Amino acid sequence: MDIARAAISAEMLGGALEAFEITVNYLKEREQFGVKIGSFQALQHRAANMFTELELCKSCVLESLSCFEEKSNDVPRIVSLAKAKVGETFHLISNEGVQMHGGVGVTDEYDIGLYLKRARVAEQIFGNSEFHRNRYAELTGY
């Protein structure tokens, strides 16, 4: 079951990366009041937060996949860490992406709404973030 959890974590990471890229491209293209909205500091801060969360997720997913290759005894613990972190991050990035797109974020005109829906479904597959946080805590002795 842990290999499936690691695989869905990798898929979710890919979705989060693509949703982030779509959002950043939109911020660079969309103009409001004659100014690219990507120049607004509040949106830059939100994008920077998404970027840092994605970098953490990359490390978690790579570590979980490495555990399988190394046949480590830490597989369940590290996989739960990855699934919890990536689930929360995909949730965050899909929410932020739709917010930054405004009303068109949930229309068929832009794909960002599809990532929002996929994030919600993938988060529940093989245990949600809460399940994996609890599992991680149990496996580390808390």
Which residues does each PLM region occupy?
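Alpha-helical interface subdomain recognition
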Residues: 2-142
